[in-house]
């Protein structure tokens, strides 16, 4: 399908399809500690999907950067952060782990999906945009 972009596909469908693509491809460098680490200091437990959550985070980050022109680690920390349960006190927003988001960006940069932006942060590369559009077209075909 010509002219299909990531914007034409539902977010959850695209993220699942791209995460499985990254997992099948096997080029994404996954840190050894992903099965035991929490994704935020506000979380009580690590993710339940011990093997696949890093790929889903990478797919989600790639889509997020595609939708916006450039994104830094700080913005991703805010995006993936959440509410911390503080007992009887009111909830409070806690940022996500910067280390995990930094490792995701470095892994995506290593396989050529994102590149460092001269203005700061990361932006999608030409090869990354082509790959994401191709996966989006395949996802749209499967849905129809």
Swiss-Prot record:
- Annotated S-S bridges: none
Compartments, as annotated in UniProt = Cytoplasm
> Domain of life, per the record?
Eukaryota
**Gene Ontology terms: cellular component:** cytosol; cytosolic small ribosomal subunit
Reported consequences of knocking out the gene: Disruption of a single RPS19 gene reduces cell growth; a double disruption is lethal. Depletion experiments show the proteins are required for correct maturation of precursor rRNA to generate the 18S small rRNA. A specific site between the 18S and 5.8S precursors (site A2 in ETS1) is not cleaved in disruption mutants. Partially assembled ribosomes are retained in the nucleolus rather than being exported to the cytoplasm. All effects are exacerbated in the double disruption. Increases association of NOC4 with 20/21S pre-rRNA, decreases association of ENP1, TSR1 and RIO2 with 20/21S pre-rRNA.
What keywords are assigned to this protein?
Cytoplasm, Ribonucleoprotein, Ribosomal protein, Ribosome biogenesis
Q: Name one GO molecular function term.
A: structural constituent of ribosome
List the Pfam families. Answer: Ribosomal_S19e
Identify the PROSITE patterns for this entry: RIBOSOMAL_S19E
Under the heading InterPro entries, the entry gives: Ribosomal_eS19 (IPR001266), Ribosomal_eS19_CS (IPR018277), WH-like_DNA-bd_sf (IPR036388), WH_DNA-bd_sf (IPR036390)
Query: Main localisation, per the record?
Result: cytoplasm
Could you tell me the Gene Ontology terms of the biological process aspect for this record? ribosomal small subunit assembly; ribosomal small subunit biogenesis; ribosomal subunit export from nucleus; translation
| Function noted in UniProt | Component of the ribosome, a large ribonucleoprotein complex responsible for the synthesis of proteins in the cell. The small ribosomal subunit (SSU) binds messenger RNAs (mRNAs) and translates the encoded message by selecting cognate aminoacyl-transfer RNA (tRNA) molecules. The large subunit (LSU) contains the ribosomal catalytic site termed the peptidyl transferase center (PTC), which catalyzes the formation of peptide bonds, thereby polymerizing the amino acids delivered by tRNAs into a polypeptide chain.
Question: Which family does the record assign?
Answer: Belongs to the eukaryotic ribosomal protein eS19 family.
Subunit relationships: Component of the small ribosomal subunit (SSU). Mature yeast ribosomes consist of a small (40S) and a large (60S) subunit. The 40S small subunit contains 1 molecule of ribosomal RNA (18S rRNA) and 33 different proteins (encoded by 57 genes). The large 60S subunit contains 3 rRNA molecules (25S, 5.8S and 5S rRNA) and 46 different proteins (encoded by 81 genes).
Q: What is this protein called?
A: Small ribosomal subunit protein eS19B
Organism equals Saccharomyces cerevisiae (strain ATCC 204508 / S288c) (Baker's yeast)
């Amino acid at each position: 399908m010509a002219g299909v972009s990531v914007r034409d596909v539902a977010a959850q469908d695209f993220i699942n399809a791209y995460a499985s693509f990254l997992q099948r491809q096997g080029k994404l460098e996954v840190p050894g500690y992903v099965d035991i680490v929490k994704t935020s200091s506000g979380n009580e437990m690590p993710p339940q999907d011990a093997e696949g959550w890093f790929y889903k985070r990478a797919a989600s980050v790639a889509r997020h950067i595609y939708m916006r022109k450039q994104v830094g680690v700080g913005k991703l920390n805010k995006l993936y952060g959440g509410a911390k349960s503080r007992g009887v006190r009111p909830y409070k927003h806690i940022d996500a782990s910067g280390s995990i988001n930094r490792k995701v960006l470095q892994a995506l940069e290593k396989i050529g999906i994102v590149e460092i932006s001269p203005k700061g942060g990361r932006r999608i590369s030409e090869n990354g945009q082509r790959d994401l559009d191709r996966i989006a077209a395949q996802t749209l075909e499967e849905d129809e």
